[in-house]
């Protein structure tokens, strides 16, 4: 994958979030995670030009949407 180390989380409502280019992974397949839990360390693995987080939101497991309004709908302001 172009993301290098990456994590995919399936949320209880069916939404999938994807986190890419991670330097370290602190969870493994099948782990149940909680809000605020550290899941990885940011990095620059894969096709990347510098350390950053690649973040995607796929409501109901469908196509990716712009995460900013999706987060805002849930009370999270960037």
State the predicted function of each range.
Residues 1-78:
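Catalytic cores of peptidoglycan-degrading enzymes
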């Amino acid at each position: 994958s172009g993301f290098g180390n990456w994590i995919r989380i399936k949320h209880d409502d069916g939404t999938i979030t994807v986190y890419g280019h991670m330097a370290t992974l602190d969870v493994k397949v099948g782990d149940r995670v909680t809000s605020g839990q550290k899941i990885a360390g940011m990095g620059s693995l894969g096709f990347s030009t510098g350390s950053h987080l690649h973040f995607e939101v796929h409501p109901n497991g469908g196509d990716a949407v712009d995460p900013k309004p999706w987060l805002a709908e849930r009370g999270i302001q960037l």
